[in-house]
Amino acid sequence: MTDVQPYLEKIVERVSVPAIQTSLKGFSKSLLFRFTDTGEEYLIRFVDGKEAVLSHETLAKPDLTVITSSDTLAGVMDKKINGMTAYMQRKIQTKGAIEDLMKLQKLML
């Protein structure tokens, strides 16, 4: 089990990068991370692609959901695990519009 908060904070920080803001222009969605090994849920709300807010809460109907273990998220973000391989092996599962999920790929990889 890995403490995911620093990794999620890193995702939020990356939203301030100008190139990422350009690719997220107008993006206002909610992204729920559900961790299978800890049972924890974290919510990131994106505001117009310019800002992201992290909170330790759940949302009944988020726009996007990522379901994974804390170790898998840490491995992907530390580049010890290939994100696409983890997805193909179903270590990372997603719910939501594929176009929106693809936009967020840059934040995790």
Model-predicted segments: where are they?
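Feature captures hydrophobic
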Residues: M1-L109
